Amino acid sequence: MMERIRKEMILMERGLHSPTAGKRFSSLSDSAGGAVLEALENSQHPARLSPRLPSAPLHGALGDLPAKGKFEIDTLFNLQHPSSESTVSSEIASATESRKKPSHYSEAAAEADMSSDVEVGCSALRSPSGLGAAPLKENNAKGYTESGSVAGTTTSASGSGLGSLHGGGGGGNSGAAALGGSGSGSGADQVRRYRTAFTREQIARLEKEFYRENYVSRPRRCELAAALNLPETTIKVWFQNRRMKDKRQRLAMSWPHPADPSFYTYMMTHAAATGSLPYPFHSHVPLHYYPHVGVTAAAAAAAASGAAAAASSPFATSIRPLDTFRALSHPYSRPELLCSFRHPGLYQAPAAAAGLNSAASAAAAAAAAAAAASSAAAAGAPPSGSSAPCSCLSCHSSQSAAAAAAAAAAALGSRGGGGSGGGGGGGAGTAGGSDFGCSAAAPRSESGFLPYSAAVLSKTAVSPPDQRDEAPLTR
């Protein structure tokens, strides 16, 4: 009887995990033989444990059935087996845990190593998707470890031990992620570029090269890089920035040009004189729209005395003599106006005598001078005091244009004489007509000109179309 009870206890410890053992264990005292046979059958196949059984029913079976067994055995035979049973179950649990621990630890360690290798070198870690993939991987690994613990362990102690082990593995993953983050931060610091500090010699050499050629070829860039001890990429970027700067300067300075070329010339000339422009500027159109800018008293006195041919520059800050031949070759929209710069005496003396503000006296004087000039041109002889014909476009007009100019000048003279109301304007006009000379060899400065009245400009002789075609319009 004792032998049978001992066998039943051993079979109970071995075959408790089968589903049928729990059902038949309550009828152990009634049908001992059947229980022994079924327990023997179950003991022959201990590996039929279903790995997908949840841990709670197993734990319940482990917690409830030994209580029944203890109660029945103690009541029947008065044997104290709880200590032995607990020691046996703890031995089994410890053996199972020791058998499962190394494998799970190696898997977790391998997973941590793999994740650390991947996350440190992968660029996905820097993106939000990579950061979201790390918790997903951790959750997957946790589920895998929990399923393994359910399949391989029979006590809650082993499950908690593996949970703590996996927690350590998760800590390893987080540590690897932190390491990868620090590595990416250091790489970003290394990629950051700082501004290149050019020396004065380097800037001077680059500016000189830019004046010579805005676009530099690659061989030339290589030569400059070797000469200036700079990377080729730096020189390329410098030339790109320099071209953009030049474009901005030209756009900023060219805003008055379509409406007023004179103001554009004035601004650009003064900018070149003050050193604001890095490139030389050649003034093409003289300054005739702004009489109040820099007109000197010396020029006014010289004009009043009638010495218009020898008058000095009317601008206080004269930059350079304005080349009238270059001005004539400039594609200006009204080339007939450029004749006035070859004949400053036509408008200079009467305007100065009238105080630079009397439009009537200026118109009268201009009418008289224009009448004299047109009559001389109609007679086929050069004007008085001139040894060679003028090179301006208006002086090379045809006979029809000269006749039209004479008619316009006569009409303008009658209108100007009525407006003057006195003989002073007429006297000044005759003086201006006598002083008028259409010679390029006259002893005067090339930049000696004064502004003229808009009424005179509107009545000036106009070149025929064939003459005007020589100066194309480039607006």
From Swiss-Prot:
Family matches, as Gene3D superfamilies: Homeodomain-like
Segments of skewed composition (Low complexity): 83-96
Location(s) in or outside the cell: Nucleus
Main location: nucleus
GO biological process, one term: limb morphogenesis
DNA-binding residues: 191-250
Region (Disordered): 82-113, 155-189
GO MF, one example: sequence-specific double-stranded DNA binding
Biased amino acid composition, Gly residues: 160-186
Key words of the record: Developmental protein, DNA-binding, Homeobox, Nucleus
Protein's UniProt keywords contain rRNA-binding: no
InterPro entries: Even-skipped_HD, HD, HD_metazoa, Homeobox_CS, Homeodomain-like_sf
GO cellular component terms, A-Z: nucleus
SMART domains to which the protein is assigned, alphabetical: HOX (SM00389)
Family listed: Belongs to the even-skipped homeobox family.
Protein name: Homeobox even-skipped homolog protein 2
